[in-house]
Amino acid sequence: MEAQSHSSTTTEKKKVENSIVKCSNRTDVSEKAVASSTTSNEDESPGQTYHRERRNAITMQPQGGQGLSKISEEPSTSSEERASLIKKEIHGSISHLPEPSVPYRGTLVTMDPRNGYMDPHYHPPHLFQAFHPPVPIDARHHEGRYHYEPSPIPPLHVPSALSSSPTYSDLPFIRISPHRNPAAASESPFSTPHPYINPYMDYIRSLHSSPSLSMISAARGLSPTDAPHAGVSPAEYYHQMALLAGQRSPYADIIPSAATAGAGALHMEYLHAMDSTRFPSPRLSARPSRKRTLSISPLSDHSFDLQTMIRTSPNSLVTILNNSCSSWSASGSYGHLSASAISPALSFTYPPTPVSLQQMHQQIISRQQTLGSAFGHSPPLIHPAPTFPTQRPIPGIPSVLNPVQVSSGPSESTQHNKPTSESAVSSTGDPMHNKRSKIKPDEDLPSPGAGSVQEQPEGMTPVKEEGDKDESKQEPEVVYETNCHWEGCSREFDTQEQLVHHINNDHIHGEKKEFVCRWLDCSREQKPFKAQYMLVVHMRRHTGEKPHKCTFEGCTKAYSRLENLKTHLRSHTGEKPYVCEHEGCNKAFSNASDRAKHQNRTHSNEKPYVCKIPGCTKRYTDPSSLRKHVKTVHGPEAHVTKKQRGDIHPRPPPPRDPGSHSQTRSPGQQTQGATGEQKDLNSTTSRREECLQVKAVKSEKPMTSQPSPGGQSTCSSEQSPISNYSNNGIELTLTGGGSVGDLSVIDETPIMDSTISTATTALGLQARRNMTGTKWMEQVKLERLKQVNGMLPRLNPVPPSKAPTLPPLIGNGTQSNSSCSVGGSMTILPNRNELSSTDITVLNMLNRRDSNTSTISSAYLSSRRSSGISPCFSSRRSSDASQAEGRPQNVSVADSYDPISTDASRRSSEASQCDDLPSLLSLTPAQQYRLKAKYAAATGGPPPTPLPNMERMSLKTRMALLGDCRESGISPLPPVNAPRRCSDGGANGYSRRHLLSHDALGNGTRRASDPVRMVSNNLSVPRVQHFNSLNSFNSPALPPSMEKRNLVLQNCTHSEGGVFRGFSSPCPPSISENVTLEAVTMEAGGSLNDEDLLPDDVVQYLNSQNQGTCDHLLNNVLDSNKMHHSVVLGNNNPSSFDRAPPASSQPAGSEVSKSDLPIQWNEVSSGSSDLSPTKLKCSQRSAVQQARAFGLYNNMMVQQQNLQRGNVYQQNGYQNLMENNGSYSLQQNTVLGSGASSSFGMQPNKPYGESVSRQPMIFGAMDSSCGITVQGQKLRSSNMPVSGNQQNFGHPIASSDQATSMANGMQNRNVMEQEYLQNELVGDGIHYQGVNQSSPMTLGQVSPTSQSSLHQGPQSCPPVSHTIGNQSSGLSVAKSYQPCANYSGNRRQNVLRNNLAQQQGHVSDGNQTYRVNTIKLEMQGQSQQFCSNMQNYSGQLYDQTTGFSHQAMKIGSSFFVSEANCLLQETATANSSELLSPGANQVSSTVDSLDSNSLEGVQIDFDAIIDDGDHVSLISGALSPSIIQNLSRNSSRLTTPRASLTFP
């Protein structure tokens, strides 16, 4: 039979081979087939022939070589044909069973493709049996059990095998592939006979063995020409079309294959990757355009862990079970169904007979046309039908294809359009059709009049192009802009990267409060975004930047949005998490947009998306279709403008909902769709997909479409790339929309998410990019824009109330932020600016929860906007949650959504944000952050540094840390008064609010989360204080000046919301790396919280320790510090620091108090131990926080370590350490040694920490050596002295000395320097820093002048620190913090004094040390709290100003000033310290360590910070979130910096 088949098909095969091999010969074709089939980008000509031919090939098969050749030429959607061609190519030289030109397609079944013999028709029953097994197979596929080695077992395997093997389809396909010459051909191609062929064959095999394919083959062979085709086709097709043959084989082979399941399995094993490979194969082959289309690389398709992915994906599994019964449908892409026909059709192809299948196929096809959901639901047959039809008759393929395209195009295709998510399900057999249809809609869009069917043939090529278009989605690459066209800027760059960096750092970051695209001719018309990340993502439309690249081998797609990439990856993995919500409908989609489209078209006749162009009455079921329509008919600009302006009503009808409700297109539409309307609809499907995508991306129905970007995205994006659509039909559509949609990051994001189909997603993203890239589109847009200029207003007003918060958020320090921060659901906030700060604040307060509404990219928005609302609790909360969760959320807002699931991504973000508090809290932000840090440390990546997000998270995280706050019972919203830091709410938190009673306690306001929360005065101060300690203490001490200062700093730093905007280095990178940050934050969602800074246990510990523990710790800190020192020193890893400090902390804690374990973390900040656990917690947080915090922490740690080593009481030892290391060395070493820098996971911090340590040492290192040593001890007792540049502590001590009248030569000098630096730094450093807040003058005031001054001193103190230099400053701040934190160290100070005294002898600075101790003692009583506040504030401010002072201030002076301020603060806060004594100490400790770390971390970021002027924020970030929380508002600011620090 084989021989017969061989001879009979030899001619045909040769023809096919000629046509295919001619083109590319096996290798080339294989390659292309693999890539393009997976990608749906068929090779042109031959490639195209075979790849699109696959499906048609089967159909053409009966016609023999002619049909095949014809199909080869025609970009049919026949996967089988393609498969066959591919396989043929692959096996070109290998003489496989000649594909018998046996004139019986139906008879095809007769041939056992495996054996190549004309075996009985096993397919009908077996096929279905195989189909049935596929359901289990699906599960197996998910489980990865479908590694069938299509063993070349020849006959193998007839019906029984097929039936018996649930993997029948998979096996058959794979086997078929190999089976051709069962043993020889199969082995030859499958085995390593041809390296290229092997992979390719594997790929084909994967197609074949893919249950989908098998099903398709069966479905196609069976359905269209069921029995006949299966028999002959498998052998014939196998040779003729590797894939189709495989499919046929599966149909006929699979049956026999099942018999030799073992061998088949082995073969599969051989092609184990083929499991996945077959996945791609069938997809490529059977439904190359389907989801598989996107996966260009066979690897991604077949060898990709589709099974794993699908297995992992519950939805996907369900879908697979439902849709791809026989396939894990290609590697578990349930809907991959790739042999979707198989899966839905074969698997569920009820008719066991080929005829029935054929009939069913036809019926399904019509149904499909009618249904458009046929592929997804019970009509799995439909899919197979399309597949079969394609397989069946050559004309049938086009015919069926056309119908499929017509019906599938509008509905299925539309669904495919996306990333063929539905397509994956629906067009199981005919991804090409669907895809073609999908593409067609794009093409149709250009010519809405064209008929859907008419375009179908075109669609074939377009299908091929679709993959390209998918890639074209990356068209922004086409844009590849290197010149800046920002308003008032015309700089030219050599590379796109440089341009992006410039835009992110100079323009986006610069406009901290306003997220407005000022790109010339931007269709957004300067409509503000809700979050910076959105703007960053949006700018990719203009620059063409596509930072998100597909990691699949052979796949070159890149996306501007992470969501789109994630969606695209689903095309490789076959994951279809979006299941139709309608009862009885099992269709699943890779993106929400496709699902929405499907639902709207199939299950609803509603067409909620109405064209807003005057005189146009078109209505669509999904936003993408509307966008496409607008772009194609009215011009990209018109749509963009409309959508951008919120003109697009689609938003009102929830994009997703419509998707759910309307399948307007379904049957009727498909029919209608054939007409111009259908075309429109087809395009609409594309558009709709895009819109839906937008929706999906938005995850919130309207959000996606509607956000300021939405309009564009939805409408403009659709057809804007009309011309593009050819490249990437959908993509183009998206591109147009992309441009516009990109206008609204949200839309873009939605598109990403919505563009579930990898292609579509990519397309959506890239379409936007394309739009930019497509000058044509831009021009059209401009024209349209002009035409629709009147409509812009409409669009703009869409959700002004919500949106207002976003732009101001970054722009103005606190207040702006407030505005920005409004919008918990910033996702859809189009006119964030329109709301006033107050409104936003109020709204935020209402929404405030944690920007829970700002689900979308609320992370940024939320944190920013929340922060923007900063005055409100929301801001902080948002920031808090945002920071913790917001950060990832922020990161993933636009790009960092869960691209994979729009809702998931956005909702994830939302959940993240909303969940922030709970979820982050559940995992404690500290824990999350630590996890991130650990992960970063483990992976060698940068520590969790989404500073902006972190900052934003700061507020939100603060909220999440409200876990801390909440733990403490801090739930009150801060008044909506002055906005705190833009992002962090720090401005408000810091500057706007004074130290409230609870704040003063250091427990009061919980970090940014709870600015004014009056919880309990002790409110678990430790936690709040421990990072918020700076804030907490500062809050009381420097509410006025701090407020101002923080305001400025906040504005500058904008840690939460405008995280990026405030930092040049970390922030800009964040902005530039927004995608990365988004991804990182998305993946490490709530890792940047206060908890991030502090481990859970530390937080708990701090909470439990509170203030009382602080004092106790103070005593034990000395011993603890000793242990700490060693421990801390031992912990040199950034993440190690996180863990190690606690570990090291434990010894110290045991010394001091095991319950102070968290102090161990604080230990990291040497003062921590002495301080209260809270302090330690803060320190820990700080450590966890990152480099910036790390600097402060580091120093503290160093000191602590030194002290520990030298024994706090053994100043000599400590001195020796100091001497050995040099005050600097010690600190530096300690920081580094203790891993404060590295420990904190801020490698950049390390250098910074080192530098900082050295710098401070330089000007006051010797001094500080002693002082620091002493201080280290003191810090142990009072945290502050321990700070790395303990000069700062020493200086603060000196300051204290002045205040305390204990002026050692060094201390005096320090004090003097500090005073000088304070004045200078405050005036110069702080102002220089750009904080330009009262802090500079406050610092001057506070400097060594008085304790009351010190109260304000925190503000001034930080500047001093800053002035010290980035590092020095950080140290100063740390010191400042520590002295402030020392208030609880009365006895600690005494001990320190003793220690210092001891130390003095050993260190030249013994006096200073002593003085510091004395001062500390005095201060403890009076200014500890104040000092703590000051420290906290200083830390924040200091961190912020550090960058500036780093540049403009003398390190030594700064150091001393900081010290003086700290001491002053301490002294001034002596009373406060009493109030905050335990908690304050803890906070102090935290501050101390924070100071060290912060300084260090800040220093790390100082360069960037200096540029960004967000130093305070940075340091704030360095400071533990608790401190930030403590200071509530102040805390917010601190928090923001903390985030910054976290993301150097």
Curated annotation (Swiss-Prot):
It holds the Pfam family zf-C2H2_15. GO terms for biological process: limb development; negative regulation of DNA-templated transcription; regulation of transcription by RNA polymerase II; smoothened signaling pathway. Residues 865-882 have a biased composition (Low complexity). Phosphorylation is essential for its proteolytic processing. Residues 463-476, 634-650, 686-701 have a biased composition (Basic and acidic residues). The keyword Cell wall biogenesis/degradation does not apply. The keyword Nucleotide-binding does not apply. Belongs to the GLI C2H2-type zinc-finger protein family. Has a dual function as a transcriptional activator and a repressor of the sonic hedgehog (Shh) pathway, and plays a role in limb development. The full-length GLI3 form (GLI3FL) acts as an activator (GLI3A) while GLI3R, its C-terminally truncated form, acts as a repressor. This is Transcriptional activator GLI3. It comes from Gallus gallus.
